[in-house]
Curated annotation (Swiss-Prot):
The complex is composed of 2 ATP-binding proteins (YtrB and YtrE), 2 transmembrane proteins (YtrC and YtrD) and a solute-binding protein (YtrF). This is ABC transporter permease YtrF. Residues 115-165 form a coiled coil. A lipid is attached at residue 32 (N-palmitoyl cysteine). PROSITE patterns: PROKAR_LIPOPROTEIN (PS51257). A lipid is attached at residue 32 (S-diacylglycerol cysteine). The keyword Signal applies. It comes from the Bacteria. Residues 1-31 form the signal peptide. It comes from Bacillus subtilis (strain 168). Part of the ABC transporter complex YtrBCDEF that plays a role in acetoin utilization during stationary phase and sporulation. Disulfide bonds: none annotated. The chain crosses the membrane at residues 293-313, 350-370, 396-416.
């Protein structure tokens, strides 16, 4: 019997009992959809956490916090590792400063000294302009201009904060400097304070030209009003502010040449005694947790698939009983037991896979509706905006589809094995005599 004839025989027999086959496929569809949708919640939460982690930092950056035995960290040593594009050392100063542009001032910026050539190698992300090339050029944060306020705007804003009584989020912030700040020259005043009294003891003023603006932060709640100054000024500032105190913080970042090498670079640094953190280390623990979580959800979903397998088993058992004469005739004309077994297993697999395919299609629709409706519901209950909830509540990757097909198809075949084995053991004489 040719394979084409076997398929024709299976389809003809399934059409004889359309209602029973339909109900069996429906049960399989519901079980598969339940498995996929339930598991997609775990995949969705993991995707949300991963995307948030990836968006909040530079993915190729490996932060170096220290070394075993409190040994000094040498920039030259870090540059020798494989796959290193650049090593950036940033020194942040915690002293009062005021940036002035015309009648506007910004007193909420942090001063960061860095090597601009290293920043250029590390592909410093800019919204506008370029990386500073001369010592009197600076790069400012995306929100720097927004913090340039007139004296009147500052006083009104501070007054509203005092009147808000602990609810500053309800206050509308002033727009600040709305024109293009690129290529503008600002006056930067830096003050030295007494460590005991907190009073200002000295003040020094510098003129800087803004040649670059950093990229907009990935999250709406994040703000960047930093001022990046060439480290050529570091010595001058150090003598004035006395960097030996606790008013400075130095951060070292090692940038890999591409994301695929971040994990290897992180492992190499860790093996040599460096205390590091990167995207891969932050996601490692989360991935382990979500792996266990997803396995648990898939296991729960498998219970529904196993229940649907009972329906497939009953359907195939009834099919063998009803086709006793046909089985006897096929055996009488020379059909081997393996062909008969294959035909019933193919029918069982057909029911399982068809139900699985329909279930997956339905799952994608349910997943889309969940991601559309849940943010609206949460926004309505919390009084916020649905657009602010940039979360994925349900996500169906290709791996989940493959898992669902394997589970449903495998369970369907296993459910049909016993009826198929029973069909091969049918006695020819008994089958033909029964019909007479």
């Amino acid at each position: 019997m040719r394979f084409k004839d076997q398929v024709h025989f299976i389809r003809r027999n399934m059409k004889k009992n359309r209602l029973r086959v339909f109900m069996t496929i429906l049960a399989t569809t519901m079980a598969c959809a339940f498995l996929v949708v339930l598991s997609s919640v775990g995949f969705g939460i993991q995707k949300t956490i991963t995307d948030m982690t990836m968006s909040q930092q530079i993915v190729t950056k490996v932060s170096v916090m220290g070394k075993e035995g409190d040994k000094p960290i040498k920039k030259a040593d870090l540059e020798k590792y494989d796959h290193v594009r650049s090593v950036v050392e940033r020194t942040q100063v915690y002293e009062p400063n005021k940036a002035t542009l015309g009648n506007r001032t910004n007193e909420s910026s942090n001063l960061i000294f860095t090597n601009m050539n290293d920043e250029l190698k590390a592909n410093m992300e800019l919204e506008k302009g370029r990386v500073a090339k001369s010592e009197n050029e600076i790069v400012v944060g995306y929100d720097f201009a927004k913090r340039l306020l007139t004296k009147k705007e500052s006083e009104e804003y501070n007054k509203k904060i005092e009147e808000a009584k602990g609810n500053p989020e309800d206050i509308k912030e002033p727009k600040g400097y709305t024109k293009d700040i690129l290529n503008k020259t600002i006056e930067l005043s830096v003050s030295k304070t007494d460590s005991k009294t907190g009073d200002v003891t000295k003040t020094k003023t510098y003129d800087f030209k803004i040649v670059g603006i950093t990229k907009k932060p990935s999250q709406d709640w994040m703000e960047d009003s930093n001022i990046f100054i060439s480290d050529q000024f570091k010595k001058d500032f150090s003598e004035f502010l006395d960097f030996k105190g606790g008013n400075v913080e130095t951060n070292i970042g090692v940038f890999a040449d591409k994301f695929e090498n971040v994990e290897q670079l992180t492992n190499d640094l860790t093996d040599d005694g460096y205390y590091v953190t990167s995207v891969t280390t932050e996601l490692e623990g989360a991935n382990t947790f979500f792996m266990v979580f997803k396995i648990g959800l898939i296991f729960v979903g498998c219970i529904a698939v196993i229940i649907s397998a009972i329906g497939i088993f009953n359907t195939m058992t009834m099919a063998v009983t009803e086709r006793t004469q046909e089985i006897g005739i096929m055996k009488a004309i020379g059909a081997s037991p393996s062909i008969i077994r294959r035909m019933f297993l193919m029918e069982s697999a057909y029911i399982g896979i068809l139900g699985c395919v329909i279930g997956i299609i339905i799952s994608y629709g349910v997943s889309y509706l969940v991601n559309l409706a849940v943010p609206m519901i949460l926004a309505a209950t919390s009084g916020g905006d649905a657009g602010d909830l940039n979360y994925t509540f349900s996500y169906i990757p290709a791996s989940l589809v493959i898992i669902a097909v394997v589970i449903c198809g495998g369970v369907a075949v296993i459910s049909g094995m016993n009826p198929a084995r029973k069909a091969t053991k049918t006695n020819v004489l008994t089958a033909l005599r029964r019909e007479l």
